[in-house]
Amino acid sequence: MEKSPPETAAAAAEVAARFRSLVDTGDIGAIRQTQHLILGRLQDSNAVLTHFNEYSEQCFAEVSNDFASKTRLLKSMKDDLDHIFLKLRSMKSRLAATYPDAFPDGAMAKTMDQRPDLESPLD
């Protein structure tokens, strides 16, 4: 029941001709022109985004070293301040133990350390 090759080719040509008759060639040209215009715009957008990414990468490289050094500086300052406040607390407690009358009642508890605890989460 299979058709011979010439009949199949003729049937395929007929189907193709009917499909071509359904669509206007002017419409196909307009679609291709619109697609070409869109392709150009997408390529321009891609070029702009690529340039922006390269610029952002360069800016990040410049800033990241500075940011890392500032972070290290802040961490060392925090460690230094923690050490200083630890020494101050121990000095205050030794003073309070040696000279209990030097501080009024309750004043020592208020002045021991009024800094907020930065390690605990905020409520």
From Swiss-Prot:
Designated name of the protein: KxDL motif-containing protein LO9-177
GO cellular component, one term: nucleus
GO MF terms held by the record: protein homodimerization activity
Highest taxon of source: Eukaryota
Subunit organization: Homodimer. Component of a nuclear cell elongation controlling complex made of ILI5/BUL1, LO9-177 and BC1. Binds directly to ILI5/BUL1, ILI4/BU1, BUL2 and BUL3. Binds to BC1 in the nucleus. Interacts with BCL1.
Taxonomic lineage of the native organism: Eukaryota, Viridiplantae, Streptophyta, Embryophyta, Tracheophyta
Recorded family membership: Belongs to the KXD1 family.
Keyword Nucleus recorded: yes
Pfam assignment, any one: KxDL
Organism name: Oryza sativa subsp. japonica
Principal place of residence: nucleus
Ranges spanned by the short sequence motif KxDL, renumbered to the chain: 78-81
